[in-house]
Amino acid sequence: MVEELIALLIMASALGMDAFSIALGMGTLGLRFSQMFKVGLTIGVFHVIMPLMGMVAGKLLSAHLGLFANWLGAGLLLWLGLVMIVSPFQEKERTFVDPSGIGLFVFALSVSLDSLSAGLSLGMVGAKMALAVVAMGVMSTVLSWLGLFIGMRFQRYVGPYSELLGGFILCGFGVKLLLPY
């Protein structure tokens, strides 16, 4: 139980790094504290909903796919980690949506899509659902708030490195799923 909790907290931190790195940029926009609160909370809610949907789908798939489900889950985590590792080095201009109304909804959805894949992986390997989604929701909320606050002051120094770290952590979990086999 403790080992699973630690693993889920590390994975939740890795997934929250994407939200953290994007929140760093959004933190430079001069948002009010009430806006920052809403942004972090909305991202957290989406980081509960998306992995929950993924875990339900993963449990259904694992019942039919058996051992292959572990390999598929590991593959998804490795793919997601590699995308996060490569992403900071791609030349692209990040555009920020207005962090209110539908813009906030679209922003939170886009930041939490990786949690859907992670949830699918966790569902396939039989992780504890409530523990996983609460860990992901809380961690992404806290990391988003942290990113927004740090972004107000230090965005140019931290930038893409947090996403890079998150990618390496997810790849590590993907490899861990493959090791027993």
Curated annotation (Swiss-Prot):
It is found in: Cell membrane. The keyword Transmembrane applies. GO terms for molecular function: manganese ion transmembrane transporter activity. Keywords: Cell membrane, Ion transport, Manganese, Membrane, Transmembrane, Transmembrane helix, Transport. GO terms for cellular component: plasma membrane. It comes from the Bacteria. InterPro entries: Mntp/YtaF (IPR003810), Put_MntP (IPR022929). Coiled coil: none annotated. The chain crosses the membrane at residues 5-25, 36-56, 66-86, 102-122, 130-150, 158-178. It is a multi-pass membrane protein. Probably functions as a manganese efflux pump. PANTHER family: MANGANESE EFFLUX PUMP MNTP-RELATED. Belongs to the MntP (TC 9.B.29) family. This is Putative manganese efflux pump MntP. It comes from Halalkalibacterium halodurans (strain ATCC BAA-125 / DSM 18197 / FERM 7344 / JCM 9153 / C-125) (Bacillus halodurans). The gene is mntP.
